[in-house]
């Protein structure tokens, strides 16, 4: 089959969504199909630009390319999943979040524009009307499935997939650090981790790996660490290679991942593959589908006090933390996450 993967791309930004699309393309090609990523440039401000992008997507005709039929369109992200195609399947990573669960959240921007409500209504109307055009609707996780049902009354099926290089993860003896690999940005809550670190009883050390979309945010985090007097217990690794990520995961005491209502989150699955316990929060969304409290990690309230207590616990109870990590690996294996299963579902 000739297959197009429809997504969006914010120039110069690379995260899990881009990795997801590439993983799907590679898996389709490995299965003998011809697959390509159709990435639409996306700008969400001012809000009327969102409407322009929605219209542009609806006007696209990708039923054939250069005289050859496109057999299937797989839509991943808004508004690219609105592109029409007679044989379209959706695997929704998330909707336009500031029009839904983040509408009145401090992270929202849409709510503060005079025309924000009108644009939000237009987004919801389009989703309600056009998502059901697809012959099948899959969600990236149960969290995304629940949002689709709650906000748009659309049924979908959760479809999990493995993280990149899943077969390369390994485990080694735990060293004296917690590892937090993620883009440096407000939704991932590195600030919360720094505030928690300032409250620990023990000399807990945290290694942050990742770069920021905005260099000034990195400066802000480092300034906060100095203000909280935890700079000596923090390591800023910046962007790291895949090999270094594998090594850091393998040698960590635990993995820290407390994002705000994450859609899915490769970090959790990578930790489980490395036999490491995960410390996350009750409002972290996707990770909660995999982390079992006090069995494969710790689920804390999203406060510095609660998170610091979790840090102290794994620091002081290393054998128990190691056992949770091994249980996490077993849990991952029981989930049967595979690209072959994903492709079978998307191409059925």
Q: Model-predicted segments: where are they?
A:
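A short, well-ordered alpha-helix in the C-terminal region of glycosyltransferases
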Residues: 309, 313, 320-335, 341
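Conserved acidic donor-binding segment of nucleotide-sugar-dependent glycosyltransferases
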Residues: 293-305, 313-318
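Nucleotide-activated donor-binding/catalytic signature segment of Leloir-type glycosyltransferases, i.e.
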Residues: 218-240
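Aromatic "clamp/platform" in nucleotide-sugar-dependent glycosyltransferases that forms part
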Residues: 260
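Conserved donor-binding/catalytic core segment of Leloir-type glycosyltransferases
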Residues: 169-188, 194-201, 207
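Membrane-proximal helix-turn-helix segments that form the acceptor-binding/catalytic region
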Residues: 108, 113-137, 145
């Amino acid at each position: 089959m000739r297959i197009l993967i429809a997504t969006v791309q914010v120039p110069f930004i690379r995260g899990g969504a881009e990795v997801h699309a590439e993983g799907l393309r590679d898996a389709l090609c490995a299965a003998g199909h011809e697959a390509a990523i159709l990435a639409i440039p996306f700008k969400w401000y001012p809000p009327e630009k969102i409407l322009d992008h929605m219209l542009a997507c609806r006007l696209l005709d990708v039923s054939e390319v250069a005289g050859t039929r496109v057999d299937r369109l797989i839509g991943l992200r808004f508004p690219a999943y609105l592109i029409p195609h007679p044989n379209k399947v959706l695997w929704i990573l998330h909707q336009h979040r500031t029009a839904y669960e983040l509408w009145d959240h401090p992270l929202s921007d849409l709510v503060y524009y005079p025309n924000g409500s009108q644009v939000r209504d237009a987004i919801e109307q389009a989703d309600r009307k056009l998502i059901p055009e697809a012959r099948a609707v899959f969600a990236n996780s149960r969290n995304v499935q629940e949002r689709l049902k709650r906000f748009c009354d659309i049924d979908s099926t959760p479809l999990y997939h493995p993280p990149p290089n899943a077969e390369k993860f390994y485990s080694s003896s735990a060293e004296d650090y917690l590892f937090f690999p993620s883009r440096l940005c407000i939704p991932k809550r590195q600030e919360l981790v720094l505030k928690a670190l300032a409250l620990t009883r023990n000399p807990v050390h945290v290694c942050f790996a990742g770069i920021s979309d905005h260099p000034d945010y990195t400066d802000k985090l480092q300034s906060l660490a100095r203000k909280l007097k935890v700079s000596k217990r923090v390591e800023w690794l910046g962007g790291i290679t895949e090999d270094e990520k594998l090594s850091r995961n393998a040698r960590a005491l635990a993995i820290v991942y407390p994002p705000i209502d994450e859609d899915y989150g490769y970090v959790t699955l990578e930790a489980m593959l490395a036999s490491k316990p995960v410390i996350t929060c009750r409002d972290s969304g996707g990770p909660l589908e995999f982390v079992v409290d006090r069995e494969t990690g710790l689920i804390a309230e999203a406060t510095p006090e609660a998170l610091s207590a979790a840090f102290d616990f794994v620091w002081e109870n290393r054998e128990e933390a190691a056992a949770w990590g091994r249980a996490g690996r077993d849990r991952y294996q029981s989930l049967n996450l595979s690209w072959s299963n994903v492709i079978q579902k998307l191409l059925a």
